[in-house]
Amino acid sequence: MPPNTANKAAEIPPFEPIAIIGIGIRGPGGINSLTTLWDTLVERKSHCFPLAKDPRFHRRFNPDDFKALFDGIPDSENVLHSNLFDETPGLDRTYFSLSEREAAGMDVQQKLLLHVAHEALEDAGYSGVEDGSAFDPSTFGVYVATATDEVIQDPRDYDTDIYHLVRTERAFLSGQICFHFGLRGPSSSVDTVCSGSITAINDACRALATGDCRAAIAGGVHVVTPVSGPISFYSIKRAGFLDRTGQCKPFLHNGTGYSRSEGCGLVVMKRLSDAIREGDRIHGVIRGLCIRSMASPKFISQPNGVFQSVALAQAVKISGVDPAAISFVEAHGPGTAKGDLAEVSSLCTVLAQHRDVDNPLTVGSLKGNVGHAEAASGTHSLAKVIAMFQRRRIPPQADFHPSRLNPTLKPFFDKHPIRIIENEEDWNASHRIAIVGNFGASGNAGFMVVEEGSTFQPLEGRDVPKVSSPLPFVISAKDQATLVKLIHLYIDWLKQPSTFLTPLSDISYATTARRFTHPCMISVQADSHLDLAKKLQERPPMIDSSANRTSRQVAFCFSGQGGERVDPRNSTLYNFSASFTDAVDMCFRIVESESLIAEEDIAMLELFALEFGLMEMWKSWGINPVALAGHSFGEYVALVCAGVLTVRDALKLLGIRAALIRARCLDVPGKMAAVRLSVSDVNKCLEQQRSTHVELACVNSDNSVTLAGTPEDLESFRQELLKSYPAAGWHLLNNMTAAFHSRFVQPILADFTNACNEVKVHPSEMVVLSGLLGKMCPVGDAVLQQHDYLVRHCRETNRFGTAISDYQRRNVESETPQPDWIEIGSHSRIISFISLASDQLKFPSHGKTAADGWTTALDTLMRLYSAGHVVDFKDLHNDINPSAHHTDLPLYPFQFEPHVYPARREAKAISTTLASANEVELCPRVPSTELAPLLLNHVMAGYTLCPATTHVALLLAAAASSASSSQHEGRLAYKLFKLKVIAGFTNTTDGWLQVRRHLATSELEIISNDDNKIHITARAEVCKEQDMLESLSLYKPFILPFKSFKSLPTTDVLRKELAYSLFNHTVNYGAHGQVLDRVWIAEDGHQAWGYSTYPGGARTAEGVPTVLRDFSPMLIESTCQLIGFLMNTSMERKDGEAFVTDELGECSIALSKLYETKYVELYASFKMVDGGTAGLGNVFAFDDKGQLISAFRDVRMAKMKIYVLKRLIDRGRKPEQVVNTQHVAPEEVEEDNDANNDLEEKVISVLKAALRLSEIPRDKTLGELGLDSLTAIDVGVQLERLVPHRRDHLTIDPEGNLAALLQILRPAPSPKSLPTTSSTKEIKLTNGDLEVKAISTPPSLPITANGIPTANGVATTNVVPAVNGVTVNGVPKANGVPKANGVYTAKMPTEPATALIANLSPEMMEAISSNPEVVQHAPGRTPLLLIHDGGGTSFAYYSLGNLDRTVIGIHAPGLQEGKGMVNILHATNEYANIARQYLKQHCPGHSKLLIGGWSLGGTISITMAAMFPDLVAGVVTIDTTPPGVGGLTAEEAESVLLHPWSRSDGIHGLVRKQLEQNTRALFANPEYKTTIRNTTVNVPVYVICAKDPFRPPESLHLQDSSSQWLIDFKEPQVAEVMWKSLMGERLLGVQIIPGNHWTMFTPANAKTTTEALRRGLDVIEGWLNKAG
């Protein structure tokens, strides 16, 4: 008997019942669900096998590791058995968005947990959306148990990297689940050895009970690894725990220990009350749980029955369950004599003492089937109990017969009603309650009381009558290929008889509201299981939902009177939507209770109730409008929706208005007519026919109006109208009760005014488009609260169309996306008046009849969802089917990649270019002499190059030779995965190519005689041909519909001769290389069909090497050449550029079929990626029977310049170099280029190795390439060794790209290699593609501490110095040569500029010749023109952040010729002409520009504003000193500005010449000062000034007045006074920002400068809007 615990009963806290609502499981023998687990149990299967003799063991482990440890242990080979997975668990790396290196750095148990967690969460119906339920990611806890590590803590014997910490620290087991699923609640990883699962579940239950989390996922994992496995086997064996003959034998006489197993189990839990309230499917309920240390006083690992009894009794007590009600125990049952004895003893003590004989306690343990999964064993046991709950059956105990019962247990079974069953039987109990026991070798153990979930029925919602109508269904996946597989799984599942037992409404609820939403999806509507299967087989169009759903908005348009009459109480929506029904009933209840509307006007009530009900329905489904518009009568409902009127007041006013109309207007002969003609033409006719007294009642749109008049007047007007406009449409509106919005309603206005005055109106809570005013009324607009608003609305012209146009215009001006439109009413006539942009949509809400209500609304809802709108599917189902429950659905079809264990150090390769001992040759070397005929068919840039298809053929041949010795039988097919070009293009004019394979990873590599250089890497797979053909057939329904464009007149049809004449600019194909006979290119240029008769003769085609006799490269070329042709003829490129293959995601090819067919039909499509520098496409091939026989998916082709390709081949360089663009002296070029290129190549090499990439794209951030926090540390350590000049710790920013990283790593430039202004353009060679790309900050200039640029200072700024636009005290020095007309001109340089220009690179010439140059492109707001500084360039403006407008920079027009300004007034005129031309060509919607500039640019801007007020809207200057300030002479100014520009070569020389001439033109020109002082600036001006003064170096020996060269603006008033004297009232503001003149655009100050500039532009535009 257990000790007396009665005195402690009060201390036991109440246990909060916890619902198990989701489960995921893995076990040996392919167990991956409750169904497969149940099959194992009822079929009495055992998944145990002897390690030494089983191929599964040899695939996963090195037998020598075991042999070394167990050598000397008798009969060890016979002793070692286990229940292992057939294969090491892999990972769908793409699904979890992991880089290759990050995935390789994860522990295999972490990978397994991610997938099982996904399945458990899907089973629970967790969608990852914060919807106010207990499924709140911020309070979702994760508790995971484990007992082993993949890599032992001492890493000395194993290869380690930055991920060693992630792999070995157990905290990452729970952490990875939190990270990848976005769960932010408590997270814990525990280790109590074999009782880990129940401990983790206990921790989760306690956290749920205390409110630490509202949902939790908990369980355990155990995988035996080749790294730690041998040692753990050895330790357990030496401890005597392992059975000597094989499988665990719970309760049997021959049990001597346990058999190890692998597995994983996770359960998702909520508090029972939450699960019931939120409609979760409840697998079981944890009623009580107790964890205690139960070790024997003598030995820690010896179980103690007395202590177990105490824990079990406490678990039962806190559960509140009668022990007699517990009918089953899933025992820990490892099969050890002492363990089984202690456990059975405790069960009898607590549960069987006073038990009736006819209520026996059944005991079982699944360890006899699956072994002991150690840390995962507890969840295995719990999964078994849940499977029993679902089936209400008890499975047999494996290998049990009463005669085999352990003799030590027999007394307990004889004395107590306790049993073990040997045959499956029903679980007959009024309440099925079970105990789950889970014990650990460390003494920690626990018991769990679990009750079946069907006992706790969810709260039923309001009973809404249902009709046989379609329901929505959504299926989504990460990519198209996976979605195709998932659809196939659904089709098979729907055809299973058991699925028909699941209500269709539950399936709809589960697919739409209880699943993760992925980017690639389909949505369908179906009214039965078979209908759903049929719709899925028809392959509905896929939807790309990767865009942010919150970006799309919707507006409501409420219908007016005159449409089809629909009684909302007869609508199918009334029987389907609770929110619609409640809203409609409320309207009728208000009217009937207060008699607000007469029976004669019931049609008006029906229309109002219908529209109000539809509005409430849409809002309940998560479709909330951003704007409301109502056509005539519809504006009443719009005002209710906006909160201006209550429902009661709106109905009251409509009732009064209707009664007044009947009483006073029916005798008035007013009629209405709709006219389809432009408003201007109708107004013209109205003006001409005033005598008819016809009035304009409604402006529906620009081309539709409604007129009012007497029948006679309308007919007369119609006749005259059709004479002038015979095509005009005319329709008399006979169903209108009165001629509203005209003089015919004048008799009711006085009384209606009194009624309106009695109604309380409220500020609008939404945007309303006023038909009365013809404009948009923002939130809270007081005009809607005027009591005469509805009176005027009744009488005056309704300008619905004008209001719509005003709203759309305002959206354009504010750059607000235009919403989609839903018409709220019984038709879709009103939204036809709304003109939409190309990407806008419009939808109806209700069909024309009552029967169309639900189908129309559902179709609109799913179209909205497909278009990217947010739909709250949970609220939808709460509305239409509140009793819906989550149910089982097909599991997500993950695409697993094999797990690779860390290698032993001695197996580590010495060099990446040499084959290590574990690599084998799969194909003989192929000499270049045999390849030569193939190369002659593939000539690029004048070189015979090895084509990609030859590489593919070599890899397929290697895969085939590997498969020949395997178990594959019959016809085979082949797959390649992740083919990457490592070394670019191979010129194999001599030498050889060879394929080698890594045994550990199965990775294939193509190497050459060039120091075993690796050219290609890939993975290969061999499969049965029939399996591949079935897989490929899934794509066929998605491809064939596109065949229709072949017959369209817009399709380009190219025969062979024309096709290859177009293709020759890229590749010159020989006779055997021209495999395409005809090509059809669609109008969009992104799709093509092709036809090739090349197959058939390919086997005997000339030039196929012997080793490739069954893998003809040209035959393969016939299946994929079309994609290269399509990209190179359709993608944007310049002459001398080509798109070349550098990566292939997947290739599937049935070669036997390809050899048999007489021809192939090809379909190819692609999209632009990487900013247009690459294309990503697919190409599929059909044989002559229409069967899909090959697919090349995710073919990536990168842009490359042909001359660059030549250079790479000539020099043997890799295609990842960056070309140095700094122009330096000729004697310095080689030294600087070599140093920069050497560093750059090393950095790229480090990044490629760390990120496991074949290339480092320039346009992606390092984070996008896979650089995570741990990899960044690793990379930083390696890069620090490359940059000894750095003394600080290197921090790598994942948000930066390669250029930013190189900028950090490169040392400060020496005096010999000073960066130039043109370095704001970085010339890159990405994948062999030379391009000029702007970077975020210009290059650095050295400056001293006081801010002046010097030739030997420290680089702390990124801006080229520029001349400041000032005169000196109004007294110009006459350095210029006066012309005869008295105008001063600057001295022209004596040295020619041609030599300087000749030294510039073509890229630099292109950069400085782009004038004007678009710095930022964001159309809409007034463009900003920024004029160059004194150095003649506008590169500094690239440092600015986003200004929300188009920004244009102007270089000095004479920069290339070495010519500066001759006269500032003449130069200003030239710049004005450039600006006018740009406006005319590129900004047709703008007549003026905002202008500005830094330094001299500001001076020119002020001048332009004074001279050309018709062109300039406003000016913003950046540190431009006003004229008349400072004390420098022209000579002194020149010496200051030219001081840092001691060099005179290349671009440096051009900038120096600009400074010389611009300084003289400005400082030596008295005309400028006189003109600008005497000219009024009539545009607004905003001034930005640097806070600190500029201090020239003492070595220049300037006068004291030089300290005033730039004013000290520490006091803003100083600057304001100075500028006020020049600008007057048009000066809107002066802003002082940190820094001095030369630091305005440095990285430290660029953000501040940007913010100041944005503020200045906003102030100017605000002033202009107010003034205009």
Swiss-Prot record:
The keyword Transmembrane helix does not apply. The modification O-(pantetheine 4'-phosphoryl)serine is found at residue 1269. Keywords: Phosphopantetheine, Phosphoprotein, Transferase. Residues 555-863 are annotated as: Malonyl-CoA:ACP transacylase (MAT) domain. InterPro entries: AB_hydrolase_1, AB_hydrolase_fold, Ac_transferase_dom_sf, ACP-like_sf, Acyl_transferase_dom, Acyl_Trfase/lysoPLipase, Ketoacyl_synth_C, Ketoacyl_synth_N. Residues 1446-1531 are annotated as: Alpha/beta hydrolase superfamily-type thioesterase (TE) domain. Residues 905-1206 form the PKS/mFAS DH domain. It catalyses: holo-[ACP] + 8 malonyl-CoA + 8 H(+) = atrochrysone carboxyl-[ACP] + 8 CO2 + 8 CoA + 2 H2O. Residues 1339-1399 are annotated as: Proline-rich linker region. Its EC number is 2.3.1.-. Residues 1234-1322 form the Carrier domain. SUPFAM superfamilies: ACP-like, alpha/beta-Hydrolases, FabD/lysophospholipase-like, Probable ACP-binding domain of malonyl-CoA ACP transacylase, Thiolase-like. Pfam families: Abhydrolase_1, Acyl_transf_1, ketoacyl-synt, Ketoacyl-synt_C. Residues 935-1203 are annotated as: Product template (PT) domain. The keyword RNA-binding does not apply. Residues 905-1034 are annotated as: N-terminal hotdog fold. GO terms for molecular function: fatty acid synthase activity. This is Atrochrysone carboxylic acid synthase PKS1. The lineage of its organism: Eukaryota, Fungi, Dikarya, Basidiomycota, Agaricomycotina.
